[in-house]
């Protein structure tokens, strides 16, 4: 088991779901919040990426997320359909 790999909140690693590997890099000086998207609305919190850091994640296949920053907490920056093996760099 690789200790550098994280899982979204409320999704245990032992769930019988197919996962994909993604990496997030936060180049900002503030935290970015990653939320799941359900329909066209914000769903549950999936992850926090701390300033100037990077994290590897295992997300459920076909996940769609949105990024919201602490500086503009009421604005969706984008909707992203996650692709296996991709690195997502913010900004």
Q: Model-flagged regions — what are they?
A:
Residues 63-73:
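Short, aromatic- and glycine-rich surface loops/edge beta-strands on solvent-exposed regions
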Residues 47, 56-58, 68-69, 78-82, ...:
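Short, intrinsically disordered/low-complexity patches at protein termini
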Residues 1-13, 75-91:
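Extracellular beta-sheet/turn segments enriched in Thr/Pro/Gly and aliphatic residues
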Residues 11, 32, 44-47, 55, ...:
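Beta-strand-rich interaction surfaces with strong enrichment in secreted/lumenal proteins
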Residues 40-64:
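Intrinsically disordered, low-complexity Pro/Gly/Ser/Thr-rich segments with frequent PxxP/GP/PP motifs
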Residues 13-14, 18-31, 36:
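Asparagine-centered strand-capping/turn motif at beta-strand->loop junctions
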